[in-house]
Amino acid sequence: MKISQAVGNACTVPASSVETHNNNPSKESKIIYLPGTNCEIKSQALLSAFTSYRVGGAAELYVAPRNIEALQASLRYAQEHNLRVTTLGAGSNLLVSDRGISGLVIATRHLRYTHFDHQTGQVTIAAGESIPSLAWEIAKLGWQGFEWAVGIPGTVGGAVVMNAGAHNSCIADILVSAQVLSPDGTVETLTPEELGYAYRTSLLQGSNRVVTQATFQLQPGFDPAYVTATTKQHKQMRLTTQPYNFPSCGSVFRNPKPYSAGWLIEQSGLKGYQIGGAQVAHLHANFIVNRGGAKANDIFCLIRHIQQEVQERWSILLEPEVKMLGEFQAA
């Protein structure tokens, strides 16, 4: 079993299944109940509703566990059936193929809890919690250290995996530890050093582990009004420099030091360039937006076109920050 990173009662499988309605008669749709949990695996579940691009086909199998036990059961099911596993958080850094994804997609959006330790200044957060919502909650408590994250459009799990960052700060700066599950359901706790953090990446990317929660070191005891005001400044900066009026995945490419990917794309004359419903944003060239009716393959072809144009002009091959899942067809 391979796991892709865009988590009671341990159950045993076999699981029972029943037939359900399927809009695609060429593919059988079913629900698989995992014994010992309130969890069910659905087949042929459309993923477009769960990605920020609002594109993508169906997952061969899809599950959204509500607790660690159900997540462990889902992983065991995948292991016993030799299924590839893809972990889905907010879907904000993903491009899912129009053809969908094979294997089991595990959505962590229902794994939600937050625990503040007011003595140590540490906060432990479940993988499915929203980063922007947390930034506001933490600011209102008067805790510093998370203000920069208010504009990160994702969940804690995804942010830990990709070392999300903004405003010269990143997850690695404040992470104490991350709790992860291995394919057999074993719980591990890893430090930032063990995660091998680098710019917008970690050893979790492409690994066989799923993040369930993370603990961060913050600084309590500040004026909530001051921290909230700083958080608002970070949010306003992103609103004025990044497109929020159309669906996107956030930044498409990593910045190739010492350059900005957006600057290279803009200087290549690509602002506003469009393929199908996918367009290079006018406000920020490192964003591709869905202007309406875009297909995942439109976005994929636009990514490839940008890479070709920038490499031809600057001899720099831009590396995608967005993770592409499934099969795509180049134009």
UniProtKB/Swiss-Prot annotation:
One of its GO terms (biological process) is cell division. PANTHER family: UDP-N-ACETYLENOLPYRUVOYLGLUCOSAMINE REDUCTASE. GO terms for cellular component: cytosol. Cell wall formation. It catalyses: UDP-N-acetyl-alpha-D-muramate + NADP(+) = UDP-N-acetyl-3-O-(1-carboxyvinyl)-alpha-D-glucosamine + NADPH + H(+). Its cofactor is FAD. The active site is at 200, 251 (proton donor), 321. It is an enzyme of class 1 (oxidoreductase). One of its GO terms (molecular function) is FAD binding. The keyword NADP applies. It comes from the Bacteria. This is UDP-N-acetylenolpyruvoylglucosamine reductase. Keywords: Cell cycle, Cell division, Cell shape, Cell wall biogenesis/degradation, Cytoplasm, FAD, Flavoprotein, NADP, Oxidoreductase, Peptidoglycan synthesis. It comes from Nostoc sp. (strain PCC 7120 / SAG 25.82 / UTEX 2576). SUPFAM superfamilies: FAD-binding/transporter-associated domain-like, Uridine diphospho-N-Acetylenolpyruvylglucosamine reductase, MurB, C-terminal domain. It is found in: Cytoplasm. Pathway: Cell wall biogenesis; peptidoglycan biosynthesis. The gene is murB.
